[in-house]
Amino acid sequence: MKKNLISRLLKPRLLSRIKNKIRSFFFLDQWTVLLGRDMDHKALAWSDLRTFAPPLDRFWADPFVWLHENQYYVFIEELLYSTNRGYIICLTLDKDLNVVSNQVVLEKPYHLSYPFLFEHEGQLYMLPETKQNNRVELYRCVKFPDQWEFEKALIDNIRALDSTLLEANGKWWLFANIQEEGGSGWDTLNLYYADSPLSDQWTPHPLNPIVKDVYSARPAGQIFIHDGRLIRPSQDCSVDYGYALNFNQIVTLTETDYAETHEHVFKPPLKGGILATHTFNSIDGLTAIDAIQLRWKFE
């Protein structure tokens, strides 16, 4: 009897479960935001990033940076563990990247995350994830940074995750993971196109899903140009949700064809209590990512 008990305890799965149970009693796996200056995607280094951690009752994720009147603002998803419903807040930073204010800027009765920001014809817009409301919703900024009005639904009757817009080749392109009922939201990337970001007539790409791969499908931030090449950040969810960042070069983008190649990966380190990272955004000299970090529960 004693021998059988010892044998069971030594099984890897059971040992792992015991270890995780002990860890979860003392530590919290918390999404946090990290900022750094003048870093492109290939120069990312954990040692050069400064962590901004929320209180222990919530997490911060999906940071998007905006520069307004020479001051940096970081729009992020905040989620209270007690409600499990995300909303959008904005951190206002001083010149030394200290947080001088923190305010809720958009909240709904349903979950919001991934506050994708873009400017069109002098107007600032936000395209947050609104999958829980079964459509892709666009918001217009009426007073920066904390007043946003609903503009329109770009696509109805769709469970879209991490919608990401790009203007290129005379069109506007909308990248998003589409989650079917009961299915995964990690491994299929769909593409839509229109003549304007304000259109409500988005044409599905004929090759949808354009990426079918848990390693690189799900968007991870704004698509950007580096050395003349279009780079699409994506999540590597092969180990777990949002485990690492991939950077993929878009080599073909037309109404009939799409192709991309993997360029670079940025993984969590093997030390320091950093377990995952799944968002990258960089604008005007400030880079923002997020990370799951182990935090002592009894601070």
For the regions a language model picked out, list residue spans one by one:
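Carbohydrate-active catalytic/glycan-binding domains of CAZyme proteins
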Residues: M1-E299
